[in-house]
């Protein structure tokens, strides 16, 4: 690969290693230019240029989704509310999405997954 500095080649190599490691762990990505980029994000001003995901990204277009998020340092009530809210929404056929941060986000996803959510 001529025309690249050693630092640029190292960055390219690191990105390729990271991509392979992510794929080995079932983590993929898509950009706004990809066909499987969620339609619901395309219409948003300043939508993410890149999103990482696990599982079937196509369900983002096939089902209703809602983000359930909250504090990383949540109270017991916050944990319970996050869990129960996601449980209820999942039972109504709604996908739960968030950034999987510690705290409320984690309990929200656990509420979805414990109830066969997507």
Model-found features: residue ranges?
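Glycine-rich beta-alpha loop segments
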Residues: 30, 36-118
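Short, small/acidic-rich helices and loops at N termini and domain boundaries
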Residues: 1-35
């Amino acid at each position: 690969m001529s025309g690249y500095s050693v630092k640029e080649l190292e960055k390219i190599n690191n990105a390729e290693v990271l991509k392979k490691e992510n794929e080995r762990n079932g983590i993929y990505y898509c950009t706004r230019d990809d066909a499987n980029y969620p339609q619901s994000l395309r219409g948003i001003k300043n939508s993410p240029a890149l999103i990482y995901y696990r599982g079937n990204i196509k369900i983002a277009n096939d089902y209703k989704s809602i983000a359930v998020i909250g504090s990383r340092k949540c109270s017991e009530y916050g944990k319970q509310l996050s869990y129960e809210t996601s449980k209820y929404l999942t039972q109504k056929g709604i996908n739960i999405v968030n950034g999987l941060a510690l705290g409320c986000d984690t309990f929200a996803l656990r509420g979805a997954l414990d109830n066969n959510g997507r």
